[in-house]
């Protein structure tokens, strides 16, 4: 008997591990109009779902526990004792009051901007929240200080090179220092270079750096209550304020400026909405503090991981918001809480850096009438993305046993430090 060739057949879908959909696809349209879908479930059914009671209470059974024996017994239920009242308030173990019972709770919500808020639209969103007109570049007065050789250090370029090398190469014994290490060191070295100008200008000694201070500023913008509060950057205070940067003609010209909107995105999309708050305006310093005028606000983005650092656009928005907050808090101390156009505008500067890339900002508060989009607006000058150096070679580059790129600082740009120094000297020279 001749053998027939074996015919290979493909196995069915269910035996190959492929899940097939039985029957026709489910309809994706709206739900059918029934009493449950139009008016909701009946009250008795809804109460049965919402009120989650133990099974023993639902069937009305007595619970037998091991409370009388005072030790665990298998098969008996765990006893439930009433909350123990210790007779005094323990702050670590006492439950706080409910939000509804807090004395500071209000029906109207407030949108909070704190140091961890990242603006989705960046500077445009901060402009709308602060009613501010943007001017690209630094003011002419600051640029004139930066370009004048009389306001520079002796051997300034070499001093800046040593400061960068100290932060990136010499400060640590690690092969490549972390950003959280070299960024604060570089900031301290640059501030030290700026302080050396106090020999030539003694009024620079009447300044003070403040860390870990808290600010609070409240304002209303188109029926929305906003507030800036909490910790922010390192603030340099002075005994005298910075004179206004823009002239009266430039301030009056801001009436014709139209603020940019980004509909359908809400300007408060990134802010934290709370109902327990206090409408507070506080500069963070007590009355009688001699260094009472904010001068420059410094932000250090020194996180090692890139997702934990603010992007340059978000950092500029953060600088604008907190420069505005410091200026608004100071304005309400000087002129009161009534919305008005300020007789003497308040100027606050800000510098942000991640240890290599610098952002410069000058903000001038012209008005505290921020409800509507009409009228005089505030002004801000921003000079963005200024590299102090291109790269720092911590480990020499070797090819075929030949050092092709030794360790050192490459691509130093002294113009960036000139702007840093000009903002430090602004208001004194």
UniProtKB/Swiss-Prot annotation:
Keywords: Mitochondrion, Ribonucleoprotein, Ribosomal protein, Transit peptide. The keyword Mitochondrion applies. The keyword Ribosomal protein applies. One of its GO terms (molecular function) is structural constituent of ribosome. GO terms for biological process: translation. Residues 12-45 are annotated as: Disordered. Residues 22-33 have a biased composition (Pro residues). GO terms for cellular component: mitochondrial large ribosomal subunit; mitochondrion. Residues 1-29 form a transit peptide. Pfam families: PDCD9 (PF07147). InterPro entries: mtLSU_mL37, Ribosomal_mL37/mL65. It comes from the Eukaryota. Belongs to the mitochondrion-specific ribosomal protein mL37 family. Component of the mitochondrial ribosome large subunit (39S) which comprises a 16S rRNA and about 50 distinct proteins. This is Large ribosomal subunit protein mL37. It comes from Gallus gallus.
């Amino acid at each position: 008997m001749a053998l027939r060739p074996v015919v290979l057949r493909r196995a069915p879908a269910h035996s190959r591990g492929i899940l097939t959909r039985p029957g026709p696809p489910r309809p994706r349209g709206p739900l059918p109009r029934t009493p449950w879908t139009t008016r909701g479930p009946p009250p008795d059914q809804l109460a049965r779902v919402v009120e989650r009671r133990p099974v023993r209470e639902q069937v009305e059974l007595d619970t037998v526990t091991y409370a009388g024996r005072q030790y665990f017994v298998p098969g008996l239920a765990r006893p439930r004792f009433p909350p123990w009242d210790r007779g005094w308030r323990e702050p670590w173990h006492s439950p706080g009051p409910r939000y509804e019972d807090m004395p500071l709770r209000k029906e109207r919500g407030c949108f909070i901007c704190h140091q961890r808020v990242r603006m989705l639209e960046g500077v445009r969103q901060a402009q709308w929240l602060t009613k501010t007109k943007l001017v690209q570049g630094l003011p002419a007065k600051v640029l004139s200080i930066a370009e004048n050789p009389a306001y520079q250090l002796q051997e300034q370029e070499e001093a800046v090179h040593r400061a960068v090398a100290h932060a990136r190469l010499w400060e640590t014994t690690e092969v490549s220092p972390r950003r959280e290490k070299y960024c604060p060191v570089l900031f301290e070295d640059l501030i030290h270079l700026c302080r050396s100008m106090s020999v030539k200008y003694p009024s620079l000694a009447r300044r003070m750096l403040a860390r870990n201070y808290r600010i609070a500023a409240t304002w209303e913008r188109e029926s929305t209550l906003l507030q800036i509060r909490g910790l922010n950057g390192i603030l340099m205070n002075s005994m005298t304020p910075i004179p206004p940067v823009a002239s009266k003609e430039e301030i009056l010209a801001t009436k014709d400026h139209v603020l940019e909107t980004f509909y359908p995105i809400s300007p408060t999309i990134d802010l934290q909405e709370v109902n327990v708050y206090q409408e507070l305006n506080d500069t963070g310093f007590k009355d009688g503090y001699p260094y009472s005028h904010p001068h420059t606000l410094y932000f250090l983005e020194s996180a090692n991981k890139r997702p934990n650092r603010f992007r340059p656009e978000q950092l500029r928005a953060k600088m604008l918001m907190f420069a505005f907050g410091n200026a608004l808090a100071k304005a309400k101390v000087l002129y009161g809480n009534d919305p008005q156009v300020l007789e003497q505008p308040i100027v606050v500067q800000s510098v942000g850096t991640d240890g290599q890339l610098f952002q410069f900002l000058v903000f001038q508060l012209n008005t505290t009438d921020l409800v509507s989009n009409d009228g005089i607006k505030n002004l801000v000058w921003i000079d963005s993305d200024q590299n102090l150096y291109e790269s720092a070679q911590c480990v020499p580059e070797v090819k075929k046993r030949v050092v092709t790129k030794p360790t050192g600082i490459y691509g130093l740009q002294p113009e960036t430090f000139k702007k840093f120094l000009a903002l430090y000297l602004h208001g004194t020279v």
